[in-house]
């Protein structure tokens, strides 16, 4: 290695800067242009600020998406609404009649 002038900053050392400027091309050659291009283009890592995407406007035909829900009749259930008491009585009578001893 050649001796480097200690007065030079590290980013100004010979060979630290590529001879051609960076571009926006994503081909294989440009991905290996420099370390920054490799991180951004090759690996997809960028540490810069991300641009905000503008929100999409509402379509002209819609009105705030506030369509009311149509009223639907309640479902009619068949049977006893209070529940069946018959099985309870049967269970109670069976337990009383069975001798345990």
From Swiss-Prot:
> At what positions is Asymmetric dimethylarginine found?
52-53
Q: Which residues bind Zn(2+) 2?
A: 25, 27, 30
**Region entry Interaction with human CREBBP, spans:** 1-24
Instruction: Report which residue ranges the record marks as coiled coil.
Output: none
Which residues does the annotation say bind Zn(2+) 1? Answer: 22, 33-34, 37
Where are the annotated segments for Interaction with the host capping enzyme RNGTT?
Answer: 49-86
Annotated site (Essential for Tat translocation through the endosomal membrane), which positions? 11
InterPro entries this protein is in? Answer: IV_Tat, Tat_dom_sf
Q: Basic and acidic residues composition bias: which ranges?
A: 85-101
What the protein does comes down to: Transcriptional activator that increases RNA Pol II processivity, thereby increasing the level of full-length viral transcripts. Recognizes a hairpin structure at the 5'-LTR of the nascent viral mRNAs referred to as the transactivation responsive RNA element (TAR) and recruits the cyclin T1-CDK9 complex (P-TEFb complex) that will in turn hyperphosphorylate the RNA polymerase II to allow efficient elongation. The CDK9 component of P-TEFb and other Tat-activated kinases hyperphosphorylate the C-terminus of RNA Pol II that becomes stabilized and much more processive. Extracellular circulating Tat can be endocytosed by surrounding uninfected cells via the binding to several surface receptors such as CD26, CXCR4, heparan sulfate proteoglycans (HSPG) or LDLR. Neurons are rarely infected, but they internalize Tat via their LDLR. Through its interaction with nuclear HATs, Tat is potentially able to control the acetylation-dependent cellular gene expression. Modulates the expression of many cellular genes involved in cell survival, proliferation or in coding for cytokines or cytokine receptors. Tat plays a role in T-cell and neurons apoptosis.
What's the protein name? Answer: Protein Tat
Species of provenance: Human immunodeficiency virus type 1 group M subtype G (isolate 92NG083)
């Amino acid at each position: 290695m050649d001796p480097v002038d200690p007065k030079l900053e590290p980013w100004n050392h010979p060979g630290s800067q590529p001879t051609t400027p960076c571009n926006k091309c994503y081909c294989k050659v440009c991905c290996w242009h420099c370390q920054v291009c490799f991180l951004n283009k090759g690996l997809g890592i960028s540490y810069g600020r991300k641009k905000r995407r503008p929100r999409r406007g509402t379509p002209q035909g819609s009105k705030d998406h506030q369509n009311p829900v149509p009223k639907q009749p309640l479902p009619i259930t068949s049977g006893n609404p209070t529940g069946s008491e018959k099985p309870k009585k049967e269970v109670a009578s069976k337990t009383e009649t069975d001798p345990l001893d």
